[in-house]
Amino acid sequence: MSQVRSKSQQGKRQAKPQEVVPATILTEQLSTYAFGTVTAGAVMVAVAAWMGGSLASIDERIQGGLDATAKSAGFTVTKISIEGLDPRTKADVLNAVAIPVDSNMFRADPFVIKERIEASVENVSEVRVLRQWPNDIWILAENRRPLALWQTDGEWKVVDQVGKPMDGEDPAEYVELPRVVGPAGGYAAPELLAQLKLHPQISEHLEVAMRVGGRRWDLRLDSGLEIALPEDAQVDEALLAVYNLDEATGVLAEDSEVTRIDARDLERFAVGLGEARAAYDQSSQIDDKSGGA
């Protein structure tokens, strides 16, 4: 009897509601099934080649089978879209991609395409390649643009918006750009200059920024004022504190007697006057030769 009741109770249980499968999972599953279909087709072609052809032509027939199966399943490249570049650079990128229309979509490896572009096209930065299934390839990139002049090992270089040197660019043609000096200064420049943009009372008067110890900056303004910043993680806070100090006292004014602001300790600023500046100039690694390109 106990077994009968158990079955009766089981019969009264409500069926579990079906779970809704997210669209992203369905898309991944469809891609997996499609890849399985292509692979299965390739295996059949390989067997046929082994049975009826020479060993030398097996690989060619396998590849042909993959392409034919992908095409019949609708997985071919029909469009390559390039965004973020000027027309001339777009043409260079398209040539570097080297993927004809109607090619097997599975062959369009985003990592390989990215490597081709970066190796062949000099004037690009921040390259991303995406496959939009089943037929489109999207290439997103930026034209490299000069951001700053960087002096390293006694030589000036032009660096782009991500801090990479732009070989072939003449620094003499970019004398209006901000200047940074010191080891790894070029690579750290984009972050500093982005932070300084929020403080035009400093950025518009920046003469040179010196990288110190690979972790912080000293700034020299065209008025002669020098600002020692803390480590990179605290630069935003330090610049805001300097701004507040200027609002209260006018330390950044051209006729200010302040010649140095030590903002390395956010709890207590040190302000230098007169002779303090001369002492600092003598110890600074920025000399007259590094002040011009």
Curated annotation (Swiss-Prot):
Q: How does it sit in the membrane?
A: Single-pass type II membrane protein
Segments crossing the lipid bilayer: 30-52
Q: Does the keyword Transmembrane apply?
A: yes
User: Which loops or segments lie on the Periplasmic side of the membrane, by the record?
Assistant: 53-293
Write out the annotated subcellular location. Answer: Cell inner membrane
User: Which keywords does UniProt give here?
Assistant: Cell cycle, Cell division, Cell inner membrane, Cell membrane, Membrane, Transmembrane, Transmembrane helix
Please list the residue ranges annotated as the POTRA domain.
75-144
Task: Give yes or no: UniProt keyword Cell membrane.
Answer: yes
Query: What Pfam families does UniProt report for this protein, alphabetically?
Result: FtsQ_DivIB_C (PF03799), POTRA_1 (PF08478)
Q: Spell out which residues lie on the membrane's Cytoplasmic side.
A: 1-29
One annotated Gene Ontology cellular component of this protein: plasma membrane
Which GO terms are recorded in the biological process aspect for this UniProt protein? cell septum assembly; FtsZ-dependent cytokinesis
Family that this chain belongs to:
Belongs to the FtsQ/DivIB family. FtsQ subfamily.
Q: What does this protein do?
A: Essential cell division protein.
Name the record gives this protein: Cell division protein FtsQ
Where does this protein come from, organism-wise?
Hirschia baltica (strain ATCC 49814 / DSM 5838 / IFAM 1418)
